[in-house]
């Protein structure tokens, strides 16, 4: 899925031609990862008049912010007292509009080869090919997949009655809902959907949680008020009728297996992060993270940079704002590869007419 996004939406609404199996696209910068840091990397490169293409294994823009906590508040973005993951993504997309980046979604990088001319040949899992002067790895924890419910055959209901994330909460209103898991996501959605779903049953393998104590206390209070149920146990089987999931079989801590009617199952077992093909690029790794310098956030391979949660260096902090800082220095570090004969001058968006032109804004006149 290849697209350009000229407005702040995080889904694929504007198509742009790809080149699966065709001639490689010759570009200046390729960003791997369309999360907040990858999106801000587009902005910092754009200020230096470097156009970027972005690859992401997900089919939507926003990375973990949109995949894991689109509606959860974020409090530590400078000058933004509070925003959700989706709002942060939408604002970043709005911010990078002037630079018209091209997104290649739902695909992973499968091949990276250094060419004799110093550029890189890159190919994705969908056959999209590039020849690029620089690569920026902003892949967070790498590609990640939800840990799934291990019940034989139940996967056929995924996306219909079995879900690993909530895209539309109203989908579960008026339904008999089972929520499985013991972390914050499981508790948060349980509490949110009580009173909206027809019934809510929470199932966890033990009577202990990896979640905020206040959420656990609220859940137990709702159980006492008969607003929902909590059960210690594990799902071991299911029943269906005419291709529709109708019941699950839950084995409790007492060893007894009980049948439970169900319309939908929400599973929150966490995510399994994987570096995937990145681990095979010849990069220096430390505990599955990419080592970089702190001057340019360049890896051991000249021309390949790593920003955000995927990198490591002394004093590293996995914060979105740290990733933004890294993206700025990485852009300046990459400029000599793209403009070898051009001296890069430090300019400020507050005062530079050149940057105002790049951003498509008018230069203010002060009396």
From Swiss-Prot:
Alphabetically ordered keywords of this record? FAD, Flavoprotein, NADP, Oxidoreductase
Recorded hits in SUPFAM superfamilies, A to Z, give: FAD/NAD(P)-binding domain (SSF51905)
Listed EC numbers? 1.18.1.2
Q: How is the cofactor bound?
A: Binds 1 FAD per subunit.
Where do transmembrane segments lie in this chain? none
**Sites where the protein binds FAD:** 56, 64, 69, 109, 144, 309, 350
Q: How does it assemble?
A: Homodimer.
- Annotated HAMAP family: FENR2
Family classification: Belongs to the ferredoxin--NADP reductase type 2 family.
Record-given protein name: Ferredoxin--NADP reductase 2
Q: Which organism is it from?
A: Cupriavidus metallidurans (strain ATCC 43123 / DSM 2839 / NBRC 102507 / CH34)
């Amino acid at each position: 899925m290849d697209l350009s996004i000229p407005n702040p939406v995080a889904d694929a609404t504007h198509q742009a031609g790809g080149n699966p199996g065709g001639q490689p696209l010759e570009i200046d910068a390729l960003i791997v990862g369309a999360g907040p840091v990858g999106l801000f990397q587009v902005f910092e490169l754009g200020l230096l008049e470097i156009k970027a293409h972005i690859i992401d294994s997900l089919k939507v823009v926003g990375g973990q912010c949109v995949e894991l906590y689109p509606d959860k508040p974020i409090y530590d973005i400078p000058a933004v007292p509070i925003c959700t993951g989706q709002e942060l993504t939408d604002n970043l997309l709005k911010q990078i509009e002037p630079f018209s980046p091209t997104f290649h979604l739902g695909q992973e990088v499968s091949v990276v080869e250094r060419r004799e001319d110093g550029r890189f040949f890159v190919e994705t899992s969908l056959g999209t090919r590039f020849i690029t002067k620089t690569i920026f790895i902003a892949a967070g924890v790498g590609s990640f997949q939800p840990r799934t419910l291990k019940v034989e055959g139940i996967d056929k209901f995924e996306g219909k009655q079995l879900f690993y994330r909530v895209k539309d909460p109203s989908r579960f209103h008026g339904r008999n809902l089972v929520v499985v898991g013991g972390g914050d996501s499981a508790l948060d959605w349980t509490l949110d959907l009580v009173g909206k779903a027809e019934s809510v049953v929470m199932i966890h393998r033990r009577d202990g949680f990896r979640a905020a104590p206040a959420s656990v206390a609220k859940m137990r209070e709702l159980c006492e008020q008969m607003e929902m149920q909590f059960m210690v146990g594990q799902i071991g089987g299911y029943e269906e009728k005419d291709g529709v999931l109708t019941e699950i079989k839950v084995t409790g801590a007492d060893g007894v297996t009980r049948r439970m009617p169900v319309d939908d199952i929400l599973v929150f077992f966490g995510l399994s992060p994987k570096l995937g093909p990145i681990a095979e690029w010849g990069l220096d790794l430390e505990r599955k993270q990419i080592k970089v310098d702190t001057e340019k956030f360049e890896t051991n391979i000249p021309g390949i940079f790593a920003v955000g949660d995927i990198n490591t260096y002394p004093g590293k902090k996995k914060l979105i704002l740290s990733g933004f800082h890294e993206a700025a220095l990485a852009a300046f570090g990459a400029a000599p590869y793209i403009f070898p004969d051009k001296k890069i001058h430090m300019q400020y968006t507050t005062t530079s007419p050149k940057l105002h032109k790049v951003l498509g804004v008018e230069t203010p006149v002060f009396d």
